[in-house]
A protein has these predicted regions:
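Acidic/histidine-rich catalytic neighborhood of metal-dependent amide-processing enzymes
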Residues: 1-50, 73-74
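Active-site-adjacent substrate-binding region
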Residues: 33-133
Length: 133
């Protein structure tokens, strides 16, 4: 996204050209802080269905699926193909203390917070696979 969305635009272009079928697109680009929920862009029917998945998540991490979400990198695919998209939402209170600063290095990422985000994303993929959208 930092370079004019070129990667996302090219990916969508190739996906359309090759008639690739996507079940969902998922983006995590808000940092590695504690996950809080997911934003979702798709149909209202799909959103109602995935709201029921909250029971599978610890409410202290993933507590919502909100309408509208995804990310800049997967937006072109969503717009060109209608692929539903998810964006991981995090507790961003400290986001600008590190984002694009000298402290914005992997070594300073809190390992446990990153693990919680990874587990949340893996759980989402599992639920999409098991129950579909």
């Amino acid at each position: 996204e930092e370079f004019g969305l070129r990667g996302g635009l090219k990916y969508a272009e190739i996906a359309v050209k090759e008639n690739e079928q996507h079940i969902a697109a998922i983006e995590s680009d808000a940092s590695g802080y504690v996950p809080r929920g997911f934003g979702f862009s798709g149909s209202d029917e799909q959103l109602n269905k995935i709201q029921d998945w909250l029971k599978y998540f610890d409410k202290n991490t993933i507590s919502y699926f909100s309408k509208g979400g995804g990310g800049a990198d997967i937006g072109p695919l969503h717009r060109q193909t209608g692929t539903p998209m998810f964006g991981l939402s995090i507790d961003g209170q400290k986001y600008f203390e590190m984002h694009h600063t000298a402290k914005d290095v992997f070594e300073l990422v809190h390992a446990r917070e990153l693990e919680l985000g990874t587990a949340s994303l893996a759980s989402l993929v599992y639920l999409i696979d098991k129950y579909g959208l």
